[in-house]
């Protein structure tokens, strides 16, 4: 705990006007900052002796769409059940939220001091834009590509910002909260055309599909004898 407080004090002394907040979480310290200060703060966290966060462990996106909203209050008995699966439910804002929809989170490690730290910056725009940290930590390359692919967050200055997990013709960003659970289209190989083709999604909403009971060969013999 004392080491964590020492780190917080050093952060406040060094970045007083460049950060929005410092939160002492259970697992690690979290810094919230604006995208305009991201590169300057990251460079100092890597190079300044009190920090020496020379290793970038992860970069990920977060979608706060409908954050803090709920179709009912937990202290009340809900009046909707099965119908929630296919009917629109009016949601209420339970937890106030006035920040941008998207955020980018960075996890750093100092091998010298054995410290971990988390950076969080909220990004605005359509598409949401944030500076790339690839020139500070080269390991950001695929992390930023993944966040771009899944959330549509654009990392300005990235030399090769292509999709990483989905195919290059994929439509949309699958980790966004408003992306359809069954997807927009499905991909299959067409032997006649000898290429992959996109088709409308053939999956049915499972909430309306009766339980499928498959034929079990273990019972076929007994049924024939009884028949």
Curated annotation (Swiss-Prot):
NCBIfam families: NuoC_fam (TIGR01961), PRK06074.1-1 (NF004730). GO terms for molecular function: NADH dehydrogenase (ubiquinone) activity; NADH:ubiquinone reductase (non-electrogenic) activity; quinone binding. GO terms for cellular component: plasma membrane. Belongs to the complex I 30 kDa subunit family. Signal peptide: none annotated. NDH-1 shuttles electrons from NADH, via FMN and iron-sulfur (Fe-S) centers, to quinones in the respiratory chain. The immediate electron acceptor for the enzyme in this species is believed to be ubiquinone. Couples the redox reaction to proton translocation (for every two electrons transferred, four hydrogen ions are translocated across the cytoplasmic membrane), and thus conserves the redox energy in a proton gradient. PANTHER family: NADH DEHYDROGENASE [UBIQUINONE] IRON-SULFUR PROTEIN 3, MITOCHONDRIAL (PTHR10884:SF14), NADH DEHYDROGENASE UBIQUINONE IRON-SULFUR PROTEIN 3 (PTHR10884). The keyword Cell inner membrane applies. It is a peripheral membrane protein. Keywords: Cell inner membrane, Cell membrane, Membrane, NAD, Quinone, Translocase, Transport, Ubiquinone. It catalyses: a quinone + NADH + 5 H(+)(in) = a quinol + NAD(+) + 4 H(+)(out). It is found in: Cell inner membrane. Its EC number is 7.1.1.-. Transmembrane segments: none annotated. NDH-1 is composed of 14 different subunits. Subunits NuoB, C, D, E, F, and G constitute the peripheral sector of the complex. The gene is nuoC. It is an enzyme of class 7 (translocase). This is NADH-quinone oxidoreductase subunit C.
């Amino acid at each position: 705990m004392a080491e964590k407080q020492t780190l917080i004090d050093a952060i406040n002394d060094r970045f007083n006007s460049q950060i929005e907040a410092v939160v002492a979480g259970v697992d690690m310290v979290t810094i919230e900052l604006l995208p305009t200060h991201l590169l300057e703060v990251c460079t100092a966290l890597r190079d300044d002796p009190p920090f020496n966060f020379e290793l970038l462990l992860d970069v990920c996106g977060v979608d706060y769409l409908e954050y803090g909203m709920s179709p009912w209050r937990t202290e009340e008995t809900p009046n909707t059940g099965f119908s929630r699966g296919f009917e629109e439910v009016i949601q209420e804002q339970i937890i106030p939220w006035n920040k941008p929809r998207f955020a980018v989170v960075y996890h750093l490690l100092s091998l010298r001091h054995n410290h971990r730290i988390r950076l969080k910056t909220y990004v605005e725009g359509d598409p949401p834009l944030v500076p790339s940290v690839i020139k500070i930590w080269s390991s950001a390359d695929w992390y930023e590509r993944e966040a771009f692919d899944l959330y549509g967050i654009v990392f300005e200055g990235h030399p090769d910002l292509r999709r990483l997990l989905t195919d290059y013709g994929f439509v949309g960003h699958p980790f966004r909260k408003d992306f359809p659970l069954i997807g927009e289209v499905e991909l299959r190989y067409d032997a006649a055309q000898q290429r992959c083709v996109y088709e409308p999604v053939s999956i049915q909403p499972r909430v309306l599909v009766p339980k499928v009971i498959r034929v079990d060969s273990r019972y076929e013999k007994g049924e024939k004898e009884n028949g």
